Regions:
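Short beta-edge strand/loop motif at the mouth of beta-sheet-based domains
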Residues: 34, 54-89, 187
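A short, structured loop/turn motif at beta-sheet edges
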Residues: 43-44, 67-68, 95-102, 126-136, ...
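Intrinsic-disorder/low-complexity, polar/charged segments enriched in Ser/Thr/Lys/Arg/Asp/Glu/Gln
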Residues: 30-36, 73, 89, 102, ...
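Hydrophobic ligand-binding cavity/cleft-lining segments
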Residues: 7, 12-65, 198-200
Length: 200
């Protein structure tokens, strides 16, 4: 069967998704990581926590750079005293921004994943007002590759984003984090073997 569009005959096939044959389910990337949390704060306050350098320092990392526009820099510096390349999410870029609604940024991989460290995935934050809790923050980390190292990075971030949202909650309850005295439960070094086994 063909469809005539502006004088061109376009064949219609049974593949309604128009998915190329080479892009099979077996070869597709790892599933996104989804995390959400209700935060007892206004949407504007939560938005500023993610989109200002002062906000980044209050819960996310010791230092940060935010240029809140498309293609602006978004750096989250967990170890600002380290040499370049070992300080955190350095030189990431804002891909999309809708004030108080949505922020999409590129994201690199931690240094322990050496062969993919400079590869970029994407992180999307969404913000939604809720009557029962204040603001819902949704995190989607996606765009993973297909190797075992990508799978390990995905597992790492699954736990990391939970910890980051724990920090966000904590700073609204107790004030900005003191980076020289962070409670033990707000540190994250990677998934435990038990957590990794449970996710498989």
């Amino acid at each position: 069967m063909t469809l005539l569009i502006s004088g061109f005959a376009v064949p219609l096939t049974a593949n309604a998704t128009n998915q190329p044959a080479a892009w099979s389910a077996e070869e597709s990337e790892l599933a996104p990581v989804y995390i959400s949390r209700c935060i007892d704060a206004s949407i504007q306050t939560v938005w500023e926590s993610w989109t200002t350098a002062a906000g980044i320092r209050s819960f996310f990392a010791r230092d940060g750079v935010v240029e809140p526009h498309v293609d602006g820099e978004y750096s989250v510096l967990f170890f600002p005293e380290n040499p370049p390349g070992l300080r955190g999410a350095e030189g990431m870029r804002i891909v999309a921004i809708e004030p108080s609604k949505r922020l999409v940024i590129t994201w690199n991989q931690p240094p322990q994943f050496a062969t993919i460290k400079e590869q970029r995935a994407l992180v999307e934050y969404r913000f939604r007002e809720r009557n029962d809790c204040g603001t819902e923050v949704q995190v989607k980390h996606f765009g993973w590759g297909q190797s075992d190292e990508w799978a390990q990075a995905r597992e790492y971030f699954r736990g990391a984003w939970e910890t980051i949202l724990d920090r966000l909650e904590y700073q609204y309850e107790h004030g900005p984090l003191d980076w020289d005295n962070v409670p033990d439960h707000l540190w994250y070094t990677g998934p435990t073997a038990a957590a990794t086994d449970a996710s498989n």
